[in-house]
A protein has these predicted regions:
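Walker A (P-loop) phosphate-binding loop of P-loop NTPases
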Residues: 18
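Conserved lysine of the Walker
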Residues: 21
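A glycine- and Lys/Arg-enriched "phosphate-lid" helix/loop adjacent to the NTP-binding pocket
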Residues: 101, 105-173, 177
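NTP-dependent small-molecule kinase module
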Residues: 2-4, 27-29, 145-227
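Hydrophobic anchor at the beta1->P-loop junction of P-loop NTPases
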Residues: 13
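ATP-dependent small-molecule kinase phosphotransfer cores
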Residues: 35-129
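Hydrophobic positions on the alpha1 helix immediately C-terminal to the Walker A/P-loop
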Residues: 24
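Walker A (P-loop) ATP-phosphate-binding motif of ABC ATPase nucleotide-binding domains
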Residues: 10
Length: 227
């Protein structure tokens, strides 16, 4: 599968809450930087002043009255600003962009879990990203039950995390469906393994997409994480 040069270094990390993708995003960013790449690390929603304000609205547990369509459009507004202000310029400059969640999360949460029409969600995603699509998406594969055990120590849940196990199960099924539909772009990572083993899988997939990460960089990233 061929990729445009500006898009080849756009990697997104996805999964249910508690899958460990944020840890892997941090490790991957360190390893890539140690390997000599310029890396922009982001997480959604957020990443710009405007997007962070929208994030606060979306995740505030007090906003229980928020409707599904309102939620979708807020996510897309935050994403559109992030692409416009940060992602597209970084890719044009030849940087590697890592994003902890992107539009696949919207598909899973708003279409599969909330029940919005999938084509409407797809159209909204496409409008927001303006042809800036990830070349590689890593889905950290773990069941909602396993993820819930990991999250138990976190304390208070945000508005999305508090939606319950049935909701998280639909999100999980959504990620499984997307991985089956787009195997060239979306790769499943066994997130039930140790952090080191999960990172080894992550690096293997990133290397397969043409980014050279030495074993020394991998080891150093893990050492820094443990400090």
């Amino acid at each position: 599968m061929a990729f445009e040069p500006a898009q080849h270094s756009f990697i997104t990390l996805e999964g249910v809450d508690g899958a460990g993708k944020s840890t892997q995003a941090r490790l991957l960013a360190r390893a890539l930087e140690l390997a000599g790449y310029q890396v922009v690390s982001l997480r959604e929603p957020g990443g710009t002043a405007i997007s962070e304000k929208i994030r606060a609205l979306l995740l505030d547990p007090a906003n229980t009255a928020m409707g599904d369509t309102c939620e979708l459009l807020l996510y897309e507004a935050a994403r559109a600003q992030l692409v416009h202000e940060v992602i597209a310029p970084a890719l044009a400059a030849g940087k590697v962009v890592l994003c902890d969640r992107f539009y696949d999360s919207t598909t899973c949460y708003q279409a599969f879990a909330d029940g919005l029409d999938r084509q409407i969600v797809r159209d909204a995603n496409n409008l927001a990203v303006a042809d800036t699509h990830p070349a590689l998406t890593l889905v950290y594969h773990i069941t909602p039950e396993q993820a819930a055990l990991r999250m138990a120590a976190r304390g208070a849940a945000d508005r999305m995390e508090a939606k319950g196990m049935a909701f998280q199960e639909r999100v999980y099924q959504g990620f499984c469906a997307i991985a089956a539909e787009e195997p060239n772009r979306v790769k499943l990572i066994d997130a039930t393994a140790s952090i080191e083993d999960v990172f080894a899988q992550t690096v293997e997939q990133v290397r397969a997409y043409g980014l050279d990460i030495s074993q020394d960089a991998v080891t150093a990233a893990l050492v820094q994480e443990a400090e």
